[in-house]
């Protein structure tokens, strides 16, 4: 998550990205966030009725826009300046601090801060030289892979699995 968020913030800082593209991306993210907060927008998203089982079916679009922003920033990584960390770090730390008070939040916050530190290290180490590029990419891919594994593990632990014996018989 933090690799995508950090790169998305870099996308907003990068001067090579047109203002129109930045405004459209931020506008979409804001619209999706408002749709999560206000049931009326959720009602319109679902064709004029409130869903019974799966509210916020459109929530994957938020992640998709964030990933598109991160990919666009990835393609412009040669433009990265260390001063962008003064924007990236507070934004990401603010997101981490939003988890205060949640169950098991300290462990999650520490792991998130560690992931953020590794992402920032990878961004600082990135240079057009081949060896530095490979090191930076390896660090970013390691963080992204670890975040994916943790998300999958937490999702499976939260929802749990159904055994074959629990299936209805015909």
Regions found by a protein language model. Give the residues of each.
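Contiguous transmembrane helix-bundle modules in multi-pass membrane proteins
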Residues: 26-40, 49-169
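Hydrophobic, aromatic-rich transmembrane alpha-helices
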Residues: 1-30, 119-127
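Secondary-structure junction/capping motif
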Residues: 1, 169-170
């Amino acid at each position: 998550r933090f690799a995508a968020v950090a790169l998305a913030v870099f996308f907003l800082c990068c001067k090579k990205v047109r203002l129109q593209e930045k405004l459209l991306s931020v506008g979409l993210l804001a619209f999706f966030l408002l749709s999560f907060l206000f049931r009326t927008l959720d009602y319109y998203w679902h064709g004029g009725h409130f869903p019974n089982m799966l509210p916020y079916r459109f929530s994957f679009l938020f992640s998709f826009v964030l990933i598109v922003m991160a990919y666009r920033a990835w393609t412009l990584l040669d433009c990265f300046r260390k001063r962008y960390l003064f924007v990236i770090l507070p934004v990401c730390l603010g997101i981490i601090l939003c988890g205060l008070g949640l169950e098991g939040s300290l462990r999650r916050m520490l792991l998130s801060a560690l992931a953020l530190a590794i992402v920032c290290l990878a961004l600082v180490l990135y240079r057009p030289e081949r060896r530095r590029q490979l090191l930076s990419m390896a660090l970013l891919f390691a963080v992204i892979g670890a975040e994916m594994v943790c998300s999958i593990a937490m999702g499976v632990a939260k929802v749990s699995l159904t055994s074959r014996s629990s299936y209805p018989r015909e």
